From Swiss-Prot:
One of the GO biological process terms: tRNA pseudouridine synthesis
Known catalytic reactions: uridine(38/39/40) in tRNA = pseudouridine(38/39/40) in tRNA
Keywords attached to this entry: Isomerase, tRNA processing
Gene: truA
PANTHER family: PSEUDOURIDYLATE SYNTHASE, TRNA PSEUDOURIDINE SYNTHASE-LIKE 1
GO molecular-function term, one example from the UniProt record: tRNA pseudouridine(38-40) synthase activity
Active site: D51
Function: Formation of pseudouridine at positions 38, 39 and 40 in the anticodon stem and loop of transfer RNAs.
Organism: Verminephrobacter eiseniae (strain EF01-2)
Subunit structure: Homodimer.
Name the UniProt record assigns to this protein: tRNA pseudouridine synthase A
Class of this enzyme: isomerase
Similarity comment: family membership: Belongs to the tRNA pseudouridine synthase TruA family.
Binding site for substrate: Y109
EC number(s) given by UniProt: 5.4.99.12
């Protein structure tokens, strides 16, 4: 039978999702735990691979097993063998035609960025950081230029293995929350920015490369129209440096309601 799992993880201690020799990865930790609980080797396929240091709030995987066990048993049993920074949130039997990656209509990511004169401490590794104030309207205008189907070569890592740089970016939403009293030394208020990205798929480092450009625009180093120029140039060298992975979260994939998966993974009304 085929099982689907929803997984959350803190990516700080891992060299990304995908299994690699001689380094610690989320996939290896999950498959080791599943294998111990199932008492047979388990190979998983995920909805979206994350890089080193990137977190997952609702990664979805599927695997095949000859065992017929209750869903709750898979959750409790697998979690019993997982490290504290990885957890199975839900388990569900799915049709053999379900594929965690190929069945996904889209993927959702969020980048959480602390704007503060002082670097993060408690949140270190879980938020990005910028020590200058950002212009929301300029960043949102620039982000809107990216929405739609485009060649995203300017935001593609040199190691990217995707067959095509053309992707459909459905939305970039930018908001600022949690303003606190002004910093006593510098006189302005720290806040948390949230950048949410929705696309059919993403290139390697695509979001972090876009983030580097949005922050440069938000700081006034470039105009919003620079984003249009980058799209036309299709040159990675012309864009800003890759932003840190710390504040990047894979919110999860989006599936058709017909698969019967938990609500957080289901396409909203009117999708796409």
């Amino acid at each position: 039978m085929r099982m689907a799992l929803g997984i959350s993880y803190n990516g700080q201690a891992y060299c990304g999702w995908q299994s690699q020799p001689s380094v610690r990865t989320v996939q290896d930790a999950l498959e080791a735990a599943l294998g111990r609980f199932a008492t047979h080797p388990v190979s998983t396929l995920c909805a979206g691979r994350t890089d080193a240091g990137v977190h997952g709030l609702m990664q979805v995987v599927h695997f095949d097993t000859p065992l017929d066990r209750p869903a709750a048993s898979w959750v409790r049993g697998t979690n019993g063998f997982l490290p504290a920074d990885i957890a199975v949130q839900w388990a569900q039997a799915v049709p053999d035609s379900f594929h965690a990656r190929a069945s996904a209509l889209a993927r959702r990511y969020a980048y959480v960025l602390l704007q503060s004169p002082v670097r993060p401490s408690v949140e270190s590794g879980r938020v990005g950081w910028v020590c200058h104030r950002l212009d929301h309207d300029a960043m949102q205008q620039a982000a809107d230029y990216l929405v739609g189907e485009h060649d995203f070569s300017a935001f593609r890592a040199s190691t990217c293995q995707a067959p095509s740089p053309v992707k459909t970016l459905r939305r970039i939403g930018i908001s600022c929350r949690g303003q606190s009293p002004p910093h006593p030394a510098l006189g302005w208020s720290p806040c948390y920015w949230r950048f949410e990205f929705v696309a059919n798929a993403f290139l390697h480092h695509m979001i972090r490369n876009i983030m580097g450009c949005l922050v440069a625009i938000g700081q006034g180093k470039q105009s919003p129209q620079w984003m249009q120029q980058l799209l036309r140039a299709r040159s990675r060298a012309a864009a800003a440096p890759t932003f840190a992975p710390d504040g990047l979260y894979f919110l999860g994939p989006v599936y058709a309601a017909g698969w019967g998966l938990p609500e957080r993974t289901v396409a909203f009304d009117g999708w796409p």
